[in-house]
Amino acid sequence: ASERPKSKRPPKKSSPAKLSKSQPNPDLKAQVPFPGIESVMHGNGAVAHVMEHVCDGVIGYPITPSTEISEIYEAYRASGGINVWDRRPFFFEPEGEHSAQSGAMGAALTGGKYISNASSSQGILYGLESHFVTAGKKIGGFVLQIAARVVSRNSLNVMAGHDDVYALLPSGYTIFFGSNPQEAADLAAIAYRSSSLSLIPAANAMDGFSTSHMQSEVLHPEPELLKRYLGDPSERIPCPSVAQEILFGARGRYWQLNHFLEHHSLEFDPEAFDNLKDFLKKNENQLDQDSAESLLQESLQWVPLEIQGSWKRQWVHSHRKGSRQRVPALVDPHSPGLTGGVQNQPDFQAGIADHLSHFASEVPRFVVQAMEEYTTLTGREYHPVQTVWTEDADWILLGMGSVTDDAEAVASHLRNQGKRVGVVSVKLLHPFPEADVIRALQGKKAVTVLERSGTTALTQLVNQALYRSFENHHTERHPGIPGLSELPSVSTAIFGLGGHDLQPRHLVAAFENMISARNVPLYYLGSKFFSDSTSPEMNALQEQLKKAYPETVSMALETGENPKLLPKEAIRVRFHSVGGYGTIASGKLLTDILAAVLGLHSKSAPK
């Protein structure tokens, strides 16, 4: 904890480069309509706060470390809480994660509501079949909340890792990844907005425990902000893309009134029927704009008195041409039908091609739109890729999740020593913002990708973007991606698997490796392959391994002492106890006191 003014956050130390951060500039904070509600909260609670005010329903099954998201939401609902549209939401706990996702998908298919599930690790893999179907059915307004956790391999582990998020990549979700509780909350709101615009479901991820259980200062999105920013999921909006207008767009009042006349022609005088048809045709382009209903009143002269009530209802409730429900209904519980029947080969491939070309391809622009709108309302700036100190940097630390906050602290320390290092934090994992990443890496000597998974999917995405930029330098084949004639060298630093501790000295070592002549391409932070044992037996075994696997000698970096990154006035408190003695609750309470009563910047983490 460090001292601060009670109601004002000091600006972060600047540099020659632009800072793109989720914390608002203090000067801007007073100017925006929704600066946020000050609180101290962990990531799970910050996400649940958004869900409480937005969701019409949640179907979830408990799994560490995301369980608390649904628990907090259900506690709010069970105590009589309603969402910002004055609707009482529902919650259901099924018998497993596969059923949870299937049920959430079914609820979302009924339209007119924001629906969520919360899951992690094996829970996501268990429901993976339903996740693919959820993305393929163009379900808008659905957000999967993820507290990212490793998938058990050589043993069980419930701590942080990106295996589960990477497993979702081929499903087609739009995937966001926050670095702290503030970003987890803000990106949750952005995820609902982008999903309702694109009709592609979204996943909002944060690191398990490192963010989900980490308490820090949060500016909660106000309920009124969420109501204004997201909009009622049951209301009508203009279709925001050509493909959506073709598939979902209403045919308009002219078509619907003529459809009514076809079913009621025998109830009309023939001459009056023809006159009414001519009247509608003459005013076809004005019918949708008849909000004052003057044309409606004029039309009644030809409508039989006994069906004028039905005619008025048809007129008033006809949907405007080209509009759709904000979250479209794809099934009707009152008229059950089949979705996703069996298709033969050409139809199935055509459906995939249509989905990717006409719907998924629109996601990047809708994400940018959602982020820009949110920035305007809150002052908290978001981009698919956030950059810090990159404009003048030669060396880049690139990552995703809580590690990027750590990387910023280490980068600040290194820059004070004259070392030109910057940080790139990926907020939109899928679809991967290749052009933004290339612009951030343009002209750099080297980049180290910080990977919280052994599958190194983020490295693969970065390498693919670099390859396409190199192709574009010779012949433009990939629109929008800047062409690079020289590429930075890319290294992969695997860290934090299963919550493995990451210290500042490890990131300093990653930087030193990057600027060295050797620049090892793949290594593990915090792990040692060989010990300094004096045992002859151990030394003999180690020599065998070194001889058989010589590459492992360089896969662990030498580290020095931890640099001192905290301000001099900061205080640190550490609790030691055994389970059941209320230590975590005491730590949370102390964090609240330090922030709310003493006005200190506060952060706490259970171990």
Q: Regions from the language model: what does each represent?
A:
Residues 3-166, 172, 189, 208-209, ...:
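Thiamine diphosphate
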Residues 57-93, 365, 370-373, 377, ...:
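Anionic-ligand anchoring segments at beta-strand to alpha-helix junctions in alpha/beta enzyme folds, i.e.
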Residues 74-77, 132-134, 192-194, 219-222, ...:
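Short, solvent-exposed amphipathic alpha-helical segments in soluble enzyme
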Residues 85, 89, 202-386:
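Conformationally flexible catalytic loops at phosphate/diphosphate-handling active centers
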Residues 149-150, 207-213, 401, 454, ...:
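Glycine-rich beta-alpha junction loops
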Residues 156-208, 229-252, 486-497:
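Conserved thiamine diphosphate
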Residues 417-446:
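Core nucleotide-handling region used for phosphoryl-transfer chemistry
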Residues 450-562:
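Peripheral docking tails and interdomain loops at the edges
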